[in-house]
Amino acid sequence: MTTGRNNRVMMEGVGARVIRGPDWKWGKQDGGEGHVGTVRSFESPEEVVVVWDNGTAANYRCSGAYDVRILDSAPTGIKHDGTMCDTCRQQPIIGIRWKCAECTNYDLCTTCYHGDKHHLRHRFYRITTPGSERVLLESRRKSKKITARGIFAGGRVVRGVDWQWEDQDGGNGRRGKVTEIQDWSAASPHSAAYVLWDNGAKNLYRVGFEGMSDLKCVQDAKGGTFYRDHCPVLGEQNGNRNPGGLQIGDLVNIDLDLEIVQSLQHGHGGWTDGMFETLTTTGTVCGIDEDHDIVVQYPSGNRWTFNPAVLTKANVVRSGEVAAGAEGGSSQFMVGDLVQICYDIDRIKLLQRGHGEWAEAMLPTLGKVGRVQQIYSDSDLKVEVCGTSWTYNPAAVTKVAPAGSAVTNASGERLSQLLKKLFETQESGDINEELVKAAANGDLAKVEDILKRPDVDVNGQCAGHTAMQAASQNGHVDVLKLLLKHSVDLEAEDKDGDRAVHHASFGDEGSVIEVLHRGGADLNARNKRRQTPLHIAVNKGHLQVVKTLLDFGCHPSLQDSEGDTPLHDAISKKRDDMLSVLLEAGADVTITNNNGFNALHHAALRGNPSAMRVLLSKLPRPWIVDEKKDDGYTALHLAALNNHVEVAELLVHQGNANLDVQNVNQQTALHLAVERQHTQIVRLLVRAEAKLDVQDKDGDTPLHEALRHHTLSQLRQLQDMQDVSKVEPWEPSKNTLIMGLGTQGAEKKSAASIACFLAANGADLTIRNKKGQSPLDLCPDPSLCKALAKCHKEKTSGQVGSRSPSLNSNNETLEECMVCSDMKRDTLFGPCGHIATCSLCSPRVKKCLICKEQVQSRTKIEECVVCSDKKAAVLFQPCGHMCACENCASLMKKCVQCRAVVERRTPFVLCCGGKGMEDATDDEDLTGGSNSMAGGSQDLLQPNNLALSWSSGNIPALQRDKDNTNVNADVQKLQQQLQDIKEQTMCPVCLDRLKNMIFMCGHGTCQLCGDRMSECPICRKAIERRILLY
């Protein structure tokens, strides 16, 4: 058994932020002096696992030698109730408490202590945990300070060992910047870091909470300074000790003269005549008060308080019980020694305080003989006795002389009896352990033999598990059936609350679950985490067990302690097969977890398109797709916010999600996509005809958001285009920024391109927010304002939809030079194949204005080399030459310039950024290819293919059809909701009267039908009791 002391250290240490300790000998594993890490777990009382901020994880010593110190234990949640930091007013103090030794009732938290608050000359007590020994420290003025380095504000990070947040960071290896150290929860301060990723996403991640490390530092930052030698050593125990080394349970004598004792007692409890008994009697330390005075209890039952200087620690081993021939052996224990446990229960309870503590389960060991397994650094003994291991105060045991010692006949007989008693105890004391082990190994014969013994407990435990649980997890059906014949408790729980059916689920034993079900086991039983066997089966990926549980009627939608149903877990584990099975069994998609996410929300948040596809295909009610969280977010909001494009497409096209639902801030999914500059989501929503002029709580439309972002990022955009912007402000007709929306690279996102796209699709430029600002008021760039106005005008006048893709198009936009606007485009850029400028402006352009690719070659477009009548107007691929007009190019199978086979012909208008009839990449604009960007960017101005055939006269008719469709959908939704209400409230038998009688199985009918029935019409269980509803 692990000692109470070690259990406490291990429990309280997980999550602590640590630095290298006094016995460090591991080089720069931690990154160097002052670098910080997190306690992840304890391998044993002697070893701790630390994950350093640089990503290194290793075991370190925390007993005997101490490799780490505790810098901040606040993330562990240790709190000192009734205290308050007198500087920052934190109440209660969480982490280490620093109490001024020179001021009355003045405390500091760790941050304020190392931050040099209060007088630096004053000495402080360090109190690591509530009730622990306070340690007096030197004044900070004389102490050395070191700078902490690691995951702090300003540091650069990537995902760490405990990362479980999908691709929020943009993908494995992507970097982000820590902006602030925050609290993951109110009970765990300084346990998280807020990170702004390079892809623009930002969120909070665990750095210490429950020992988790979501991040790894690639460029550390400074986290302030600290007093290294004032930080406690992890694992070093000084609780319940005084400066003299006395502990609770120690035996003490008084060896001083009466006059000296009386003098030392002044101010330490004084002296009375009743204390004379203490001069000749050995007492036991039973307490240490706040002034470090020692409370001693004597055999008479009296307790006296002493100055520690008065007392002398007595010898803990009573050598009188061991023969004199065992010289030297009686004063010291060794591993392997035989020892007898004290008989006196009252005495051993007192002695065990601070030495592993007393447990009622230790009662059978009194007076028994055991063997020393381990000796701890504080001299406590780990003794194996009666088939179990416990930690004892050395004063609570008596050493049995070794077999070879010179003993008297009497003592030799006594030793022989004790050894015989030892072996008898091992045989009888291990019977439950033997039963559990035999059941775990599937040894049917041995289990049967053990069960015949009268002293066996069929529900007895070994290592916290019963024989039934062991057999269930290992799939031993024959053993299970035998145990069931002996009235085993099917619902017995282990320390985690798991029952036999939980163990069967964990071990992937479907046949065991069948046996347990027939035996009457509760398949919906929950453990301490509120998990059912179905939760465990889903999390472990045991599909057959999931099917078995559902076949036997296991409830498919029970929630665990975090509110997650098996559906949530299946989505998290990306198990679409289990998802389908659960939905077919009637799992409720609408149940929300503790964070307010139902299954659809969860799939959208996780960015799991396959799960979303399954959910949408099996939705019992179509409107569930628009269910809101408590903050008003729908699944579409979450997909738009996190840039999960595939999920959003499924919600829009397969789920027919309402595009204009508003959250509590009155934001639509389009607001969120524009705010995060997720161009693909913006395009998807606009093409699906989302309303462009919905206002949020501040009155802002998506266009307001886009232009606000443009203003903030304008300097960076100008820097990207510095080679062009020096010539002349760009004209709206050039569509330069509109082309940028077709580019999917993270560096190419442009709020201005989104703004132009919204305007080109009819966004209102005059609508004002609550501050009285129109979108144009938020745009200080007159050129962009002009572009927006022209895009909007083209939309309203029908020009957007009527652009001809013909090579003979008179569209001046595609013919004008994008730099000077005076000359026509006549220069082919290589290698991208775009035509953007005239020959005079082309030398100034370093990057293609359409795709932003580096320009490596410039070729002026000449006459057709075949007919010499027209200009060359078709780009041959893959050679990249433009040497023939449209008519001549259609006849060629090889390029006349290089004789390469022509695999593809790209029209002039497509090279200019327009849309051509021969563009084979019309649906590939999402992939980000150069041609697809050029072809798709013009398509951005067309919400859907109907735009080509619309005229100004028939738009209202189409709008009316759309409105009628929406009304019909709303009516259908209301009708179905009404039908659901009827099904829930009407009697399922007669279908005429309201349901007002409920049976014990949970089903119900009307009273008239219920009174005539003996079994439930739904589940066919016998009706034991009827309850009327009022």
Swiss-Prot record:
Residues 957-986 form a coiled coil. Zn(2+) 1 binds at residues 85, 88, 109, 112. One of its GO terms (biological process) is notochord development. Residues 6-74, 143-221 form the MIB/HERC2 domain. Pfam families: Ank (PF00023), Ank_2 (PF12796), MIB_HERC2 (PF06701), SH3_15 (PF18346), zf-C3HC4_3 (PF13920), ZZ (PF00569). One of its GO terms (molecular function) is ubiquitin-protein transferase activity. Zn(2+) 2 binds at residues 100, 103, 118, 122. Its EC number is 2.3.2.27. Keywords: ANK repeat, Cell membrane, Coiled coil, Cytoplasm, Cytoskeleton, Developmental protein, Membrane, Metal-binding, Notch signaling pathway, Repeat, Transferase, Ubl conjugation pathway, Zinc, Zinc-finger. PANTHER family: E3 UBIQUITIN-PROTEIN LIGASE MIB1, E3 UBIQUITIN-PROTEIN LIGASE MIB2. E3 ubiquitin-protein ligase that mediates ubiquitination of Delta receptors, which act as ligands of Notch proteins. Positively regulates the Delta-mediated Notch signaling by ubiquitinating the intracellular domain of Delta, leading to endocytosis of Delta receptors. It thereby participates in many processes regulated by the Notch signaling pathway, such as midline cell fate specification prior to germ layer formation, patterning of sensory cell differentiation in the ear, neurogenesis of the hindbrain and commitment to a secretory fate in the intestine. This is E3 ubiquitin-protein ligase mib1. It comes from Danio rerio. The gene is mib1.
